[in-house]
Regions:
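Residue-level recognition of oxygen-bearing side chains
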Residues: 94, 111, 167
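A short glycine-rich, Lys/Arg-flanked "PGG" loop and its adjoining helix->strand segment in the class I
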Residues: 113-125
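Non-membrane alpha-helical structural segments and their capping/turn regions in soluble enzymes
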Residues: 61, 109-113
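Class I (Rossmann-like) S-adenosyl-L-methionine-dependent methyltransferase catalytic domain
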Residues: 1-75, 80-85, 128-201
Length: 201
């Protein structure tokens, strides 16, 4: 029973769609993984508990400090405070990058593209890029554009939204392809969350 509780603790806060990738064997213990926009590390916990080489970066200094406090074995080099558009990692450094509920805070289309392009730069060829973010897919007629790429969505919040046109454009510009079918969950017509699992070609 205690062992089962321990396993549940490892995955309690992990994005359910990231868990799907974990269970499918997407990630190997020899891979370098980056959680881009990691916050306090909710999606890093399983990897840390299972001895993966995982890195995290976030612009929020307090969140990184909390993550370091909870995981004292992690070095400053593995948890830099940095914006996604200026990642302090070499080209082709990581086998996999995770970005969950981050990109919809882009200020505009240029900012979104800068963050995406920077993640692709750090990703190795044939590496995977996992993205979860809000989109307009399924609620196209219920969102209100207020600035370049930023909308008010039916739940009242302001988000940068991924559109099919933008997705196609970005995939072509960054030489990306789908590893899995594109998925979108409509939450009672209040917001739509899309999941992308992409490969750098």
């Amino acid at each position: 029973m205690q062992e089962n509780i321990s396993h549940l603790d490892q995955i309690a806060q992990t994005d359910i769609y990231l868990l799907d990738q974990i269970m499918k064997g997407r990630y190997n213990a020899t891979d370098k993984i980056l959680d881009a926009g990691c916050g306090e590390g909710r999606n890093m916990h399983w990897f840390l508990q299972n001895d993966f080489e995982i890195y995290g970066t976030d612009i929020n200094e307090a969140a990184i400090a909390q993550l370091k406090s909870a995981n004292p074995d992690l070095t400053a080099e593995s948890l830099p405070v940095a914006p996604l558009e200026k990642l302090p990692f070499a080209d082709n450094y990581c086998n996999h990058i995770i970005s969950s509920a981050v990109l919809h805070f882009a200020k505009n289309t240029k900012h979104f593209k800068a963050m995406l392009t920077e993640m692709v730069r750090v990703l190795k060829p044939n590496g995977s890029l996992f993205i979860r973010m809000t989109s307009d897919i399924g609620i196209e007629n219920k969102v209100k554009l207020i600035s370049d790429g930023v909308y008010i969505i039916p739940d009242g919040s302001k988000r940068f939204l991924l559109t099919k046109t933008l997705l196609t454009e970005c995939m072509q510009e960054n030489n990306l392809s789908f590893l899995e079918p594109f998925k979108t969950v409509n939450v009672d017509d209040l917001r739509c969350m899309s999941t992308l699992v992409l490969q750098k070609n």
